[in-house]
Curated annotation (Swiss-Prot):
GO cellular component: cytosol; glycine cleavage complex
Assembly, per entry: The glycine cleavage system is composed of four proteins: P, T, L and H.
Gene behind this protein: gcvH
Record protein name field: Glycine cleavage system H protein
Keywords for this protein: Lipoyl
Any single biological process term in GO: glycine decarboxylation via glycine cleavage system
Family of this protein: Belongs to the GcvH family.
Described function: The glycine cleavage system catalyzes the degradation of glycine. The H protein shuttles the methylamine group of glycine from the P protein to the T protein.
Annotated TM spans: none
N6-lipoyllysine sites (modified residues): K65
Cofactor(s) this protein requires: (R)-lipoate
Species name: Mycobacteroides abscessus (strain ATCC 19977 / DSM 44196 / CCUG 20993 / CIP 104536 / JCM 13569 / NCTC 13031 / TMC 1543 / L948) (Mycobacterium abscessus)
Keyword Heme applies: no
Domain of life assignment: Bacteria
């Protein structure tokens, strides 16, 4: 059974979203996703300052099994990327909801972020999607 924390939002593309402030979120891939990928060997992330559009690709996770695209869960600007993944991409496997985070994003406004998060899955909905 994979871990699905109740306090996060989820996408059908297996990303998690944690609200970190009025207009900010942290993004990563779920425990289910990392278990399906196998050993992660490389993570390609966008540059800080990049503008992401909800539903568009923003990077890749490469594992011993495959290369998978990362999809932006919300429209926002990249304010941080996890540089630790350059030297230790396996953090995505060992701690997908903690040290294995991918990017921090900032939405244009709290209202925009509220609306975007309302469109995502909750833990129960994501659990149903992975059964």
């Amino acid at each position: 059974m994979t871990e699905i924390p109740a306090d996060l939002h989820y996408t059908e593309e297996h990303e998690w979203v944690r609200r970190t402030g009025d207009t900010t979120v942290r993004i990563g891939i779920t425990d289910y996703a990392q278990s399906q990928l196998g050993d992660v060997v490389f993570v390609q992330l966008p540059d800080v300052g990049s503008e992401l559009t909800a539903g568009s690709t923003f990077g890749e996770v490469e594992s011993t099994k495959s290369v998978s695209d990362l999809f932006a869960p919300i429209t926002a600007k990249v304010i941080a990327a996890n540089g630790d993944l350059d030297s230790d991409p396996q953090l995505v496997n060992s701690d997908p909801y903690g040290e294995g985070w991918l990017v921090d994003l900032e939405a244009a406004s709290a209202a925009d972020l509220d609306a975007a998060l309302n469109d995502l899955l909750d833990a129960s909905g994501y659990g149903d999607a992975t059964d």
